[in-house]
C-alpha cells in the first residue's frame, strides 16, 4: 500500500514491512513529508519495488531479522545509494512497533516515579 503525504510526489519514500510499523512511525513523528510504502509482507517486495522508481531517497524501516535484511539487500541491489537503512532508530528491538511499545512503557514508568515523589 502506498500512502502519499501530499498530492505532489515526495522526494523520499519510507518503506515499512507491516502496517503496525507504519502506524508506529506516524505516532513517533518520523514520517515527515515523505510518502510511505507498506509492504504488508516482505514477500511483496518485488511487486512493490516498481512503486519506488520515481523516488530519489528510499528509507527502510524493516524488521531487524533475516527477512528484513534480505528485503533491504534486494532494495539496495535495485536502487543502490538511494536506499538507507533506518533500523538503527530501533536498535535492540525487532521492529519499530516494539520500539514504540518499549518507549511508551518507559515513559509511563518514569511518569509514575515522578508522581510517587
Give, region by region, the residue ranges found by the protein language model.
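TOPRIM fold recognition
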Residues: 11, 27-117
Amino acid at each position: 500500500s502506498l500512502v502519499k503525504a501530499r498530492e505532489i510526489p515526495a522526494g523520499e519514500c519510507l518503506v515499512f514491512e507491516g502496517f503496525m510499523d507504519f502506524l508506529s512511525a506516524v505516532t513517533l513523528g518520523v514520517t515527515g513529508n515523505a510518502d510511505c510504502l507498506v509492504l504488508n509482507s516482505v514477500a511483496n517486495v518485488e511487486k512493490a519495488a516498481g512503486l519506488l522508481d520515481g523516488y530519489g531517497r528510499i528509507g527502510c524501516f524493516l524488521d531487524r531479522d533475516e527477512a528484513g535484511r534480505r528485503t533491504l539487500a534486494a532494495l539496495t541491489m535495485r536502487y543502490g545509494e538511494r536506499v538507507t537503512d533506518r533500523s538503527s532508530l530501533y536498535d535492540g528491538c525487532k521492529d519499530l512497533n516494539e520500539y514504540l511499545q518499549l518507549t511508551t512503557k518507559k515513559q509511563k514508568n518514569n511518569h509514575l516515579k515522578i508522581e510517587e515523589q
